[in-house]
A protein has these predicted regions:
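Structured core elements
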Residues: 8-9, 27, 47-49, 59-61, ...
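Short flexible coil/turn linkers enriched for glycine and charged/polar residues
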Residues: 4-7, 19, 54, 66, ...
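Long C-terminal interaction/binding lobes of large macromolecular proteins
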Residues: 16, 63, 69, 81, ...
């Protein structure tokens, strides 16, 4: 529901992931250079993109004439954050399915075809209903049918490509007045340790997201 801190938590993500490797820095720099990003400078910080929910499918995954990369490519090796997920256009959300599966996006127009990198961590936030509350909240103003239509904007096929879905409750006054939780620096320390353990198990540069069932 509104005020639960889900958007704030997502926007803290840029301070948590491990830095880009040397090869990843070059990948991100090439994308930024190809897009003519103003004021871009090479850095080890991972990209964080948060497009508005009115973005078109072409703006999200790429397209247009001439062909241009979309937000998913600009977020390559970083985070693509979709706030108010169920407010996005259905065709834009559905266009994410193949890139999330393959880590790249194929763009075609007339005789031109380009395959662009799109290996991202997708993070999204959504309310349980159009009014922001959902049927379990006595203050919910939405009809059951309206809530059903709202949630149907996230298809089962796209939901299957989201590894983790977490319900976030609105914090109580008591919890807000209690001891503070972990800060971003502490979380980052745990993430870096977990990444090293994962590299020892899978090999340098490989993550659980890229591991196969075999």
């Amino acid at each position: 529901p509104p005020g639960s801190g889900k958007s704030l938590a997502a926007r803290r993500l840029p301070s948590i992931p491990p830095p880009l490797s040397g090869g990843e820095v070059l990948e991100v720099a090439r994308i930024a250079g190809a897009c003519g990003a103003p004021g871009f400078r090479i850095a080890s910080k991972r990209p964080f993109r948060a497009p508005h929910h009115t973005v078109s499918a072409a703006g999200l995954v790429g397209g247009g004439n001439p062909l241009r990369p979309g937000e998913i490519t600009l977020a390559h090796r970083g985070v693509l954050f979709l706030d108010e997920l169920c407010e996005f256009r259905r065709d834009a959300l559905e266009a994410l399915r193949e890139p999330l599966e393959s880590g790249e996006v194929a763009l075609s127009r007339a005789n031109s075809r380009q395959v662009l990198p799109a290996r991202i961590a997708l993070v999204a936030a959504a309310n349980p209903g159009p009014c922001g509350r959902g049927e379990d909240d006595p203050d919910c103003e939405c009809a059951t049918a309206a809530i059903r239509r709202y949630r149907a904007l996230l298809s089962g096929a796209l939901a299957d490509r989201i590894d983790m879905i977490v319900a976030v409750a609105q914090p109580s006054a008591e919890s807000m007045a209690g001891a503070p939780g972990e800060n971003s620096k502490e979380v980052r320390r745990r993430v870096l340790f977990a990444r090293e353990v994962m590299y020892d198990r899978l090999g340098e540069g490989r993550t659980n997201a890229s591991a196969t069932a075999a």
